[in-house]
Amino acid sequence: MGMDYTPRQIVEQLDQFIVGQKQAKKSVAVALRNRYRRMKLDEGFRDEIVPKNILMIGPTGVGKTEIARRLAKLVGAPFIKVEATKFTEVGYVGRDVESMVRDLVEMAVRMVKEEKMAGVMNEAEEEANKRLVKLLVPESKKKPAMKNPFEMLFQSDGSDGDDETTEQDSHDEIRSKRKRIAHQLALGELEDHIVSVEIDEVPPSMFDMLQGSGMEQMGMNMQDAFGQFMPKKKKKRNLPVSEARKVLTQQEAQKLVDMDEVAQEATSRAEGSGIIFIDEIDKVAGKQENAANVSREGVQRDILPIVEGSTVVTKHGTVKTDHMLFVAAGAFHMSKPSDLIPELQGRFPIRVELEKLTVEDFKRILTEPSNALIKQYQLMLQTEGINVEFTDEAIERLAEIAYQVNQNTDNIGARRLHTILEKLLEDLSYEAPEITMEKVEITVGYVDDKLSSIVQDKDLSQFIL
């Protein structure tokens, strides 16, 4: 876990993926560092320190979600993103707000299970190789038991001794074969050999109909209860040794992992370091003018106890939300943060306003991050043997176009660059397998040729860019 990062180090890490938005990065970095500080306090005082939840305000595509997602990945914390508009007030058809906590716990269980399985992978692979040897050289079929009592009377006297000798010879032969096969497996000589492997068959859930109705938890509990009484079905699959080894290693690793211990550690991690990102919070804010807004206020009132700190029942046990970090975000075009109910406003003491992207920001987004868009397209086209180079003037022109289209139509932030680059390189991507040139240079002239007519026609740019 990277909980011991300093705020400055956290911001530096976020800078590798997200351009600008210094204030938002500082706020989340301090919130994360406060968790580390809290863990170093005496246990008696630790429970008194509650996380300072964050409300991010800014248009779409400026980095709100990405900041929270990268932050969680950085420290290995359980993280989920939910949309406030997906929830309904208790009593209505739809998902209830407690499902976000259950989803977070499920995420934590997956994380901890993967970590535990990674820790026993060497031992699991050894066991998998032993099973492979047995599958490649199976036991000889035993002589069928006597079904007729007269067989014992008429059986010749020396047959028992002969059978024992034959059986011993058979065992020795199998042992010798298995030793030889184990050596061949170690050398990788049998990787393409086909072997029959038994795997658990996952039956279709009879409770899928409960999805989205707010009754998922009841469905999961019923399925677990029935699962204990109903034996697991097995099915055989013919796989190459290389694939069979992966399947068997996973099976053996699961046997070595204590799921009770996993559930306990996962709930503890979700409670102490879980991050829940609630997007579109502005869509449930609004003045009480009609019935729809009354329902929105109901969602806010349901979210309130979760954010304040309450106990939620999950299939892995009860989970407290007191020390989870909640990050809410919204564009607030049609409403203001003050339109949220006062109690909920008070639970998000840190307000961060993210800035709109400038031409300079777009230039940096295209080139600076470690996963920059231009790098992505260059690597994709390199697989076809084409090296694509962008001139500085072309990059500047792309940034200007993105900014201009955002100003003239809907402002979708950095996501505009995806659309523009896809349109720019559409022909090149289509013809790439047939192009013999090793290097293609994207100049400002090429950009203007492909995009200027679309940008100038406002109606057309609304549909294409």
Curated annotation (Swiss-Prot):
GO cellular component entries: HslUV protease complex
Region (Disordered) location: 153-175
UniProt record, GO biological process: protein unfolding; proteolysis involved in protein catabolic process
Keyword tags: ATP-binding, Chaperone, Cytoplasm, Nucleotide-binding
SUPFAM superfamilies: P-loop containing nucleoside triphosphate hydrolases (SSF52540)
CDD domains for the chain: RecA-like_HslU
One GO MF term attached to the UniProt entry: ATP binding
InterPro entries: AAA+_ATPase, ATP-dep_Clp_protease_ClpX, ATPase_AAA_core, Clp_ATPase_C, HslU, P-loop_NTPase
Sequence similarity: Belongs to the ClpX chaperone family. HslU subfamily.
Protein name: ATP-dependent protease ATPase subunit HslU
